[in-house]
Design a protein with these regions (language model features):
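Functionally constrained cores in energy, signaling, and assembly domains
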Residues: 6, 21-23, 28, 69, ...
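Short, charge-rich amphipathic segments
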Residues: 1-9, 35-46
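Short, basic/aromatic recognition patches
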Residues: 1-24
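Short beta-strand scaffold segments in enzyme catalytic cores
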Residues: 21-38, 124
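Zn2+-dependent cytidine deaminase-like catalytic core
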Residues: 38-138
Length: 138
């Protein structure tokens, strides 16, 4: 995972005002080493989630689907199949601290179906409880 792109996505997740809660996610589509589109999780529903949600109750927009949707405004589906997707999750630690740690951002089954269907080359995600040094994201 490219550390610069990862840090951009972590900042995007932290700044996401569309969700309130213990965790936030952001995803990025990377084409030829460049971040070309991003997406964040949202409480807003979206028609794409009816197709790619993991079940019929999973209607809220996932970061991966949002990033794919935004990428398809810029590139063709054929070009998308040459892209990577990066997914980051940040969460508050279990100890009640106000900082952020990385969380497991492995795509759900619905998002993984979308990633596979659109032919994305590689998938990168953050792992659980990796301390984000002392950086404060507000």
């Amino acid at each position: 995972m490219n550390p610069k792109i990862k840090q951009m996505l972590i900042r995007l997740a932290a700044e996401n005002t569309g969700v309130r809660g213990r965790f936030k996610l952001a995803a990025g589509i990377v084409y030829k080493g460049h971040l070309i589109a991003t997406g964040v999780n949202s409480y807003k529903s979206h028609p794409l989630m009816w197709e790619w949600g993991k079940n019929q109750h999973s209607i809220y927009l996932h970061a991966e689907i949002d990033a794919i949707k935004n990428a398809l405004r810029l590139i063709t589906q054929n070009q998308l199949s040459k892209c990577d997707i990066y997914i980051v999750r940040i969460k508050h630690p279990d100890n009640g601290s106000t900082g952020w740690v990385e969380g497991l951002a492995k795509p759900c089954s619905g998002c993984m179906r979308a990633i596979t269907s659109f032919g994305l080359k590689r998938v990168f995600w953050t792992e659980d409880n990796m301390l984000l040094l002392n950086e404060q994201f507000t």
